[in-house]
Regions:
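Conserved N-terminal phosphate-binding loop of PLP-dependent enzymes in the Aspartate aminotransferase
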Residues: 3-476
Length: 476
């Protein structure tokens, strides 16, 4: 069988059995020939476009096929046309327990029925309870503050680092994602003909992914490749560096893991050069373990941010770390105090959801993590068997419940490696074919897939069967 054509980048558990892939498509009403499945979605989107630019409220949702989703339960989602899908997107990974997990939902209903409201003055018992849970179970967090989104948390982390160090320059990762604000809205999935060949040691030009970022500000941000300690030293030698921010695993472009000793090397360089090491665990935190991936790696950052799986889909984020740094939010000298404010910070609904989520993760001696690890391993082994059988040049990268198929002959170590070898076109085509047949992989190449506690062995088996069928047809 010939290999696929190259298209490199230059520019609470649900236990009901799942049907077979073909039965699934028939029962769900998903079209198998690719026509007419999303008529109601199109109608709703056309209405929305009259009032919302582009019809969506986040640019990441503007993907093909354009689908309006109306319901999520467990490991499944439904669209406006009645089509049902096994969900491996999980809204960019927050739904670690599954959609509408009963334990979390009950906690939210309870807090509302008990009269909780947004008070905007003083504090609440809920936020203190959540803060204690986090500080007790995450070694890197001695003190914590709450915000609404991961972007807010990374913004505040960088501001805090600049205040503490008295420096302005920061280091970010090419291909990483740390939010929408000016410090990090750059160098996402940059075409290689734009950023040029690999530089090590060295830095890449700031390539904004948004208009409206002042050029003067761009000069303070230095993108380098992941897994490259020499380039960290290079930047620190040239600029007074306030912070380095990175995901411990690059999960915006699949699953790119740190090389042996890399995170430990960042810790040593932070101590040597005096910059603040910020680990962005918005995607990795709670999904890979209560203490985050930093705990797994045995590395203690200065600051760490959490979100997504922290509240199983409810909007809340956390910024925590060393108390001596966090205390700058209440510094006795007003000229040194770092402003942190927000009307909706620690809103009782997402706060209750976060408490319930963490409680659920702690139950039964880690049954959630055992279950998703078992399913993740089954998915990886099944995919690898399919790829071998079909002779596909591809590998499977996985960490626990998160996985990605790379259509290349090795797991990438950074963006340059991925962009130069992965078959993006083939990847995206496979994802779209799977969606048409009731398996929802986010339809953008090299994006992480996520397994939840609500997925079952039957879900995994049905998914593997459908992937085998589609890859067989595509690779003939």
């Amino acid at each position: 069988m010939p290999l696929h054509n190259s298209d490199k980048v230059l520019d609470t558990q649900v236990t009901s059995p799942s049907p077979s892939p073909d039965e699934f498509c028939h029962q769900a009403g998903v079209d198998t020939d690719g026509s007419g499945a999303y008529a109601k979605s199109a109608q709703i989107l056309n209405h929305n476009r009259r009032f919302i630019p582009g019809g969506v409220v986040s640019v990441n949702r503007a993907v093909q096929p354009e689908i309006v989703f109306v319901k999520g339960q467990g490991a499944h989602i439904w669209d406006a046309d009645g089509n049902q899908y096994i969900d491996y997107h999980a809204a960019f990974a927050p739904h670690f327990l599954g959609h509408n997990d009963p334990y979390v939902t009950d906690a939210v209903i309870s807090v509302l029925q008990n009269g909780a409201s947004l008070f905007g003055s003083g504090t609440t018992e809920l936020e203190g309870h959540l803060a204690e849970l986090i500080c007790r179970h995450i070694p890197a967090v001695e003190s914590v503050q709450f915000l609404n989104t991961g972007s807010e948390a990374t913004y505040q982390a960088i501001r805090l680092a600049r205040a503490v160090t008295g420096r302005d320059h920061i280091v970010v990762m090419q291909g990483g994602y740390n939010g929408w604000h000016d410090d990090v809205s750059c160098n996402l999935m940059t075409p290689l003909d734009v950023i040029g060949p690999r530089l090590s040691p060295g830095e890449y030009p700031y390539i904004p992914i948004s208009a409206g970022i002042p050029r003067e500000h761009q000069q303070l941000v230095h993108p380098i490749n992941f897994n490259d300690l020499e380039s960290v030293e290079y930047v620190c030698q040239k600029y007074p560096t306030a912070a380095l921010i990175t995901e411990p695993i690059l999960q915006n472009i699949g699953i790119i893991k740190p090389s042996t000793g890399y995170l430990q090397g960042l810790r040593r360089l932070a101590d040597r050069w005096g910059f603040v090491l910020i680990i962005d665990e918005v995607k990795t935190g709670f999904r890979h373990g209560i203490g985050g991936y930093a705990k797994i790696a045995g590395v203690t950052p200065d600051l760490v941010v959490f979100g997504k799986a922290m509240a199983n889909g409810y909007p809340i984020a956390a910024l925590g770390g060393k108390k001596k740094l966090m205390d700058w939010f209440v510094h006795p000298d007003p000229s040194k105090r770092v402003l942190l404010a927000g009307t909706y910070n620690a809103h009782p609904v997402p706060t209750a959801a976060a408490i319930a989520t963490i409680e659920r993760l702690l139950m039964n001696d880690g049954e959630v993590y055992r279950h998703v690890e078992s399913l993740g391993r089954k998915m990886q082994e099944g995919l690898e068997k399919i790829l071998r059988t079909l002779g596909c040049e591809a590998v499977v990268a996985r960490q626990g419940s998160a996985f990605c198929i790379y259509f290349m002959d090795h797991c990438p170590r950074d963006w340059h490696d991925l962009a130069g070898h992965h078959d993006f076109g083939f990847d995206e085509e496979l994802r779209k074919k799977l969606i048409k047949r009731g398996t929802y992989f986010f339809p953008v190449a090299a994006k992480q897939c996520s397994i939840s506690f609500a997925h079952t062995i039957a879900d995994i088996e049905a998914t593997l069967e459908q992937i085998h069928k589609q890859l067989s047809a595509m690779s003939r």
